[in-house]
A protein has these predicted regions:
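Gly/Ser/Thr-enriched, mixed-charge loops and adjacent short helices
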Residues: 26-35, 46, 141-266
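An N-terminal, well-structured beta->alpha segment
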Residues: 22-95, 101-102, 177-209
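Short glycine-rich phosphate-binding loop at a beta-alpha junction
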Residues: 73-83, 107, 212-215, 311-315, ...
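N-terminal small/polar loop signature for handling phosphorylated ligands or for N-terminal nucleophile
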Residues: 71-72, 77-140, 227-289, 346
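Phosphate-binding and adjacent anionic-ligand microenvironments
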Residues: 271-273, 309-484, 488-492, 498-518
Length: 518
């Protein structure tokens, strides 16, 4: 992705051969035809479905939508970046072409964490486009869009779906691939540098002095940057597990080999903690001194505690220890997905909350208001972030003279376990949820008990905020939810012991697997 955008590709309407014919596509129709669907803050799909034409059209629709709501006015800059997937570079070229053809300049921030690009957009007051598939398999990818003030929300997504975009028919071949050469500008490090300074300036040099931290890099786009930031903060940093091949690390469904590696590394190197992220480095992983990975929602509670939040916004799927801890004045529950968490944070700010934060079950942490700590200001970053979670938990342990395992043990002992069934048809999972949640509470309780009572007893409560969340009379919880951006069926389980939560999850996964066929 070196060099300048080719002059021959600047005009969307003419080439040397003469006048081009136009093609118009409606985004909502393209979604169905291409199988590339909108999920959280953008689009995701199989790489084979995300041809250049689809990626171009979606990005053009994003630009047009921003023009329609007055955020763009025919010229200016849009920052772009990407993760380390092999398909990312090609998709970034299609994104850059769409931006140029709409009269704007793509500013290439290179490969960097999603929150680093979003933060740069907030600082520069420009929209951003991040090419990333996050944690999903390498045969898939995605495009995540943010406005000048942060992530696109659900109403923005609806506005983008309503767009129609027009472009030269000859711009793409019969396979939907670009017929012109596109080279975005040479990448710069300004966004990465700003993200590094964000944490070093706030937390201070040498705040982690004396701590030995392992960094599980794998193929995370922020793997090297994590080492740099923690080193600047004074930690003794040990890079671990770097991979040239992309590894789809899911912070909610850890691979068995990553669980084993965490414990092995902690023992071998005597680490105080091991940290990592998913592929685009917006979802954290952090272990205790024994190499046991903390659940994302548990890490979120500890991070919110460090920042002294008075309002915590979190999806309905997250551990109820946040309420049971009594640490926070208000806990707001939302649907699953960062746009819903952001909307909840915006509401809390409008109601006058002092310090508003949010987190998800995947560990992604969102800061909804500026944080003042010892006279240093950490600016709001209302998008998922990972590095701040690592540092906050490490410093909380230092301040309280505790090991990370001890911090976790001091919270209410509620354990959550989640897993997913891959290649589970979305229409089938949604149909099964609909069978058990008709809106008639008595009828639904009986239907649920017919399936689950032999294992969990009577139903005490049903929550359909997002999927189907069932609380049983023994205070055990199961939450069944189709994924919003992949053919996956997730199950979250919560109980008073880790073994029981694992047992519940295993039972539910077995039941759900039998639902694949009508």
């Amino acid at each position: 992705m070196k060099g300048e955008v080719k002059a021959s590709s600047l005009s969307p309407w003419r080439r040397e051969s003469g006048l081009m014919t136009k093609k118009t596509v409606w985004i909502e129709n393209l979604m169905g035809k291409s199988n590339v669907q909108f999920g959280t803050s953008g689009a995701r799909g199989l790489v084979s479905d995300m041809n250049d034409e689809v990626c171009y059209a979606y990005t053009a629709a994003f630009v047009q939508y921003l023009e329609g709501v007055g955020e763009l006015s025919g010229n200016g800059t849009i920052a772009i970046g990407g993760d380390l997937r092999p398909s990312t570079d090609r998709i970034m070229r299609a994104v850059a072409k769409a931006i140029v053809d709409r009269g704007y300049t793509p500013e290439n921030c290179g490969t960097l964490p999603t929150p680093a690009l979003a933060y740069y957009g907030l600082l520069q007051k420009v929209p951003t486009v991040m090419v990333t598939g996050s944690h999903i398999p390498v045969d898939r990818n995605g495009i995540k869009y943010t406005k000048k003030e942060g992530e696109i929300l659900k109403h923005d997504e609806a506005g983008m779906k309503c767009q129609s975009v027009t472009f030269p028919r000859e711009l793409f071949d019969e396979k939907g691939m670009l017929t012109v050469e596109v080279e975005p500008p040479f990448p710069h490090n300004s966004a990465i540098d700003a993200y590094r300074r964000r944490y070093v300036d706030f937390f201070g040099n040498n705040c982690l002095s004396g701590k030995k931290i392992g960094v599980y890099q794998h193929s995370a786009v922020g793997g090297k940057l994590m080492v740099t930031i923690l080193s600047h903060l004074g930690a003794d940093v040990i890079p671990l597990g770097f991979s040239e091949t992309f590894i789809p690390v899911d912070t909610e469904a850890m691979r068995p080999e990553d669980i084993v590696s965490g414990r092995m590394w902690a023992d071998e190197y005597a680490c105080d903690a091991i940290v990592s992220t998913d592929g685009d480095s917006d979802r954290p992983l952090i272990s205790d001194e024994r190499g046991r990975w903390l659940r994302g929602d548990l890490a979120g509670i500890l991070c919110a505690d460090y920042f002294d939040a008075d309002v915590v916004v979190t999806p309905v799927s997250c551990n109820t220890a946040v309420e049971k801890s009594g640490l926070f004045k208000t806990v707001i529950r939302t649907k699953i997905g960062s746009p819903f968490v952001i909307e909840g944070m915006q509401h809390a700010r409008a109601m006058g909350a002092r310090c508003v934060v949010g987190y998800e079950a995947n560990g992604g942490f969102l800061i909804g208001s500026d944080i003042d700590r010892n006279g240093n200001i950490l600016k709001a970053l209302p998008t998922r972030d990972a590095v701040g979670v690592h540092i906050a938990i490490l410093l909380l342990a230092i301040e309280r003279k505790r090991k990370i395992s001890e911090l976790a043990a001091e919270l209410p002992q509620r354990y959550t376990v989640s897993n997913r069934l891959k290649n589970f048809p979305t229409e089938r999972s949604m149909a099964k949820i609909a069978e058990l949640s008709t809106g008639d509470e008595g009828k639904d309780a009986k239907a649920i008990e017919a399936v689950f009572s032999a294992y969990f007893g009577k139903v005490a409560g049903i929550n359909t905020t997002d999927g189907l969340r069932i609380t049983f009379s023994n205070d055990e919880i199961i939450h069944l939810r189709p994924s919003g951006n992949a053919p996956e069926f997730r199950c979250y389980a919560e109980a008073d012991t880790e073994n029981r939560a694992e047992e519940i999850n295993k039972i539910c996964m077995g039941i759900m697997d039998k639902w694949r066929q009508p």
